[in-house]
Amino acid sequence: MKLQSGSAPRSALAVLAAVLLTAILPAPAGAVAHRADGKVTDWRGDATMLSGQTRISRGELIHDDWLYDDYGANLDGGPNTPAFRAALAPTRGDYRYPTNANRYGHNAADLRQLRVAADGAGLHVVAFLQTLKDRDAPIVTLAIDSGRSRDEGSWPSGEGLDTPAADHFVTFSGSAATVTDSRGRRARLRRPGVNMAENAIEVDVPWTSLPATRGRTVTMYVVTGLLDPATQGYRQVPAGGPTAAAPGGGASGSTGVFDVGFDPDEVFSRAIGSHWGEERQSAALAQRDVSELGHTFDLSHLEAGVTDDYAPAPGRFYDRIFRSAQDHGEGIELKNPTGSNAGGSPEPQFLSPHQPYGLYLPEDYVPGTPTPLLLNGHSLDVNHNEYQAVSPNLYNQLGDERSSIVFTPLARGMDTWYIDAGFVDVMEAWEDVKRHYSTDEDRTHITGYSMGGYMTYRIGLLMPDRFATATPYVGPPAYQLWLPPGDPQPPGDYQVAGHTNNIVYNGLNLPFEINNGGVDELVPATGAQAQAQTFRDLGNPHLFYFYPSADHFALIFADEWGHTRDWMERYPSRNLEPTEVRYKRYPSMDLPQHGMHFDGAYWVDGMVVRSPGDECAPGDSACQEANGSVEALTFAHGRARSSVQQVQFAYPGPPFPADVRGTDRVPGGPVSATNGFDARLTNLEAIALDVASMGIDPAQELYATLTVSDGGGPFTLTLRGDFPAVTATLDGQPVPVRQTAEGIELDLVLAAQHLLVVTPQ
């Protein structure tokens, strides 16, 4: 390390003694030794994984930043369309990355997490970037202020910031690191450690480079930008659009900073349309002043290995971050919003492993107490912060007033339609919520607006046993457009696989509240009305609120969700053991590449469609159309089949008057319980039933009527349960029985209607 003139000299003996002492002293209890070697496994503190939040854990200061918030200064005072597809989710910042995606990935200066530790040798710092395609694309500055500096002036490495004053500035890229004091004296530090797999850059800062800092209360600030190879400082952001080598959107004298950390109080101004957690940041950068975006703490807590008692506050909105198991690369895919994918496409847009989702904890949330959960899908061209930015009253009425957690996945993009990568992201975010918060799986509901309404149909009808209610708002029944009696548009592999009208059959035990407007310019009323008619024809429990005067955006801007709150309270819990189950299986709707097969619900699963099989080649329309179905009734509950009751009334509002029609499912009356079931099968060659959930006693003789409507053929029936040794007959003729660890398997040949009897030996 070399110091410029004016620094305090130290003897070689003193330096050697300090190094030896540091080497032989153990780290304090709770602390972990660190070294900037690129091996990030020595960073072991527990992060909040909540954007903007900071804590100390095991002697590490850990700050989690907002993801995809790296848009620099708001110089023009208004929202701006991002470089990527996001027509309804503008940024406040104006900066845009160089178009060389192989180097910058449209996301190169996005700080994901900062960690700082301390020991007898000095400070240890690691910055995790959301995207790191090139180790020398980003540059990071950590400013440290103990309140001693009285020097004003610009930050030292081209950041373009004037305040706050700080004692020291630690600036580093993937290849070099320096520390500069408030008087401009600069020392070169050891080469940073880089871990490209973890997008991490580490740097060690000895106390000798930070005089009179150790053990003090300090305020830290962290900013990021793009490295200028010529100056080894911040690349300036010129006016105009970006080029392959240079960013754009700046102005003469504007800051070179794209992202700022330590912002726990980010706002989402409804009138402005801020969706990315960078409104305060972008305003501060326009003023070249980040003095309000810092974190003050006692450095001695790091050396002492302190762990604080951080817990998220209830009654507020967060962006939570989780690490996906999916490998899509890193960076942002721009996804051209014109041409063949004008309505969107299933390919992921946000590629990096760490993904955010919106999370609201209700005012009365108590960790450890099972809490209702609401999955709330976002619209096309908007993100996971949509409801915080546009309709925050949703969190009051569907969160606080129901004591419910609400979460909104990003779904890997603004236009993925929850079909492939977006569907998987929902499931991963859902698992993260359940893993870290106290949720009640029996009181889980699903809703969403526009494309999120489509998600409500799709996920709700593929997995109806996961939810208590489903409430699509202005959701198209099909991926992307349906004008009946015509086919959904555009044509292609999702014309069948993306059409939820095909699986309304599955909603027998999932009450739907459907909401659509009569003058909707994006989701035509004809498709919504046809979807509701299918619910009526099948007798599914539902209400269809039809608002004659409402356009596509009227309901979300009105921000009134009272009747949906009441709907969820009317059906607070799912019924996992219904008397009747209906399920239609489309193999083309599976996601075999992700290990996801939708082959039943409740006490039915293992459905195998007779032909053409369980996986479809692209363009194989016959395979896309193939489906099989079951309608089953257990006699063991002692109830007859349910009946349908029509519902119709005029709803006065709020927010607008609506014509409401629907059907209630009236439970069947009591009958003598018998140990058996009835199953009506179409185009299936196998099915499995869970007899315990059906109320059937496997130790007693079991009777079943099996009816096929497609000509029949070989059929495998699996009955899951604790069966003793049994024999079986079909229409009085013996059939072979295979005893398995799960229960019994019966190989049958079905033609019309049959009587199956299973008898314990």
Label every PLM stretch briefly.
Residues 32-176, 225-233:
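Surface-exposed, glycine/proline- and aromatic-rich loop segments on solvent-exposed faces
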Residues 32-51, 143, 147-169, 209-296:
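Acidic/polar low-complexity flexible segments
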Residues 38, 121-131, 201-206, 677-681, ...:
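Short, well-ordered beta-strand segments enriched in hydrophobic/aromatic residues
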Residues 259-356, 360-361, 537-542, 548-761:
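Alpha/beta-hydrolase-fold serine-hydrolase catalytic core, especially in secreted/extracellular enzymes
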Residues 363-369, 416-451, 461-467, 506:
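Gly/Ser-rich "nucleophile elbow"/oxyanion-hole loop immediately N-terminal to the catalytic nucleophile
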Residues 370-436:
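Active-site machinery of serine-nucleophile hydrolases
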Residues 382, 442-503:
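Primarily recognizes the serine-hydrolase "nucleophile elbow" in alpha/beta-hydrolase
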Residues 480-481, 485-569:
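The feature captures the conserved acid-bearing segment of alpha/beta-hydrolase catalytic domains
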